[in-house]
């Protein structure tokens, strides 16, 4: 019964059983390897997603910080311009008040100057009248002297 033919036949009959056992072991190993790969992939995807989320949040924080700094820089210039504009407007109002005061003073000086001119003119007129009166008085005096000399 243990002839080479019977052994090979027996082996042939056992081969499919061994192959089946081997293929089950291989499939279990393959299945566990695939499960391991899936688990590793899931873990790495989760880590990558977390890292991406952290990076995204950090980028948002940095962008917000940059935007705040830019706003502060721009607002600093705008604020300075606004302060300067208010200062200029205040100076304009003060200058307008000063110009109005000087205008009133100029009008007063013109009125005083006109009054002085009128007074000087009147003095000049009075001086002329006095000279005329003096001349007339001299004429009258001379006429009276002549009359008085003629009577003597």
From Swiss-Prot:
Expression sites by tissue: Expressed in the whole plant (at protein level).
GO cellular component: BLOC-1 complex; endosome
Any Pfam family matching the protein: GCN5L1
Disruption phenotype: Longer primary roots and more lateral roots in the RNAi mutant.
Subcellular locations according to the entry: Cytoplasm; Endosome
Keywords: Cytoplasm, Endosome
GO biological process: endosomal transport; late endosome to vacuole transport; root development
Function statement: Component of the biogenesis of lysosome-related organelles complex-1 (BLOC-1), a complex that mediates the vacuolar degradative transport via the intracellular vesicle trafficking from the endosome to the vacuole. Probably regulates the PIN1 and PIN2 homeostasis through its interaction with SNX1.
Assigned protein family: Belongs to the BLOC1S1 family.
Subunit structure: Component of the biogenesis of lysosome-related organelles complex-1 (BLOC-1). Interacts with BLOS2 and SNX1.
Name of the molecule in the record: Biogenesis of lysosome-related organelles complex 1 subunit 1
Gene: BLOS1
């Amino acid at each position: 019964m243990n002839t080479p033919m019977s052994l090979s036949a027996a082996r042939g009959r056992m081969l499919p059983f061994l192959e089946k056992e081997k293929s089950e072991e291989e499939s279990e190993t393959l299945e566990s390897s695939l499960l391991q790969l899936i688990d590793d992939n899931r873990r790495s995807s989760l880590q990558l997603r977390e890292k991406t989320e952290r990076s995204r949040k950090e980028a948002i924080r940095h962008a917000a910080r940059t935007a705040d700094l830019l706003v502060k820089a721009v607002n600093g210039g705008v604020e300075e311009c606004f302060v300067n504009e208010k200062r200029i407007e205040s100076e304009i109002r003060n200058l307008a008040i000063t110009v109005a005061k000087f205008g009133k003073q100029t009008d007063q000086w013109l009125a005083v100057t006109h009054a002085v001119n009128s007074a000087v003119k009147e003095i000049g007129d009075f001086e002329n009248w006095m000279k005329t009166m003096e001349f007339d008085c001299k004429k009258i005096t001379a006429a009276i002297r002549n009359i008085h000399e003629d009577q003597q």
